[in-house]
């Protein structure tokens, strides 16, 4: 298992991201 490094250079544990947030771009409307 590889560890991801933060910009500071320290080894960082991988954070879990909800994958649903990636699909949110489906409605092509922009909010201002």
Curated annotation (Swiss-Prot):
Effect the entry attributes to changing residue 28 to S: In 50% of the molecules
Function noted in UniProt: Protamines substitute for histones in the chromatin of sperm during the haploid phase of spermatogenesis. They compact sperm DNA into a highly condensed, stable and inactive complex.
Transmembrane segments: none
GO biological process, one term: cell differentiation
UniProt-annotated stretches for the region Disordered: 1-32
Name under which the protein is recorded: Protamine-1
Species, as recorded: Esox lucius (Northern pike)
Other remarks in the entry: The heterogeneity indicates the existence of other protamines.
Keyword match Cytoplasm: no
Keywords of the record: Chromosome, Developmental protein, Differentiation, DNA condensation, DNA-binding, Nucleosome core, Nucleus, Spermatogenesis
Record's subcellular location: Nucleus; Chromosome
Annotated tissue distribution: Testis.
GO-annotated cellular components: nucleosome; nucleus
Keyword Nucleus: yes
UniProt superkingdom: Eukaryota
């Amino acid at each position: 298992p590889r560890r991801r490094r933060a910009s500071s250079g320290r080894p960082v544990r991988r954070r879990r991201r909800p994958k649903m947030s990636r699909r949110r771009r489906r409605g092509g409307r922009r909010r201002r």
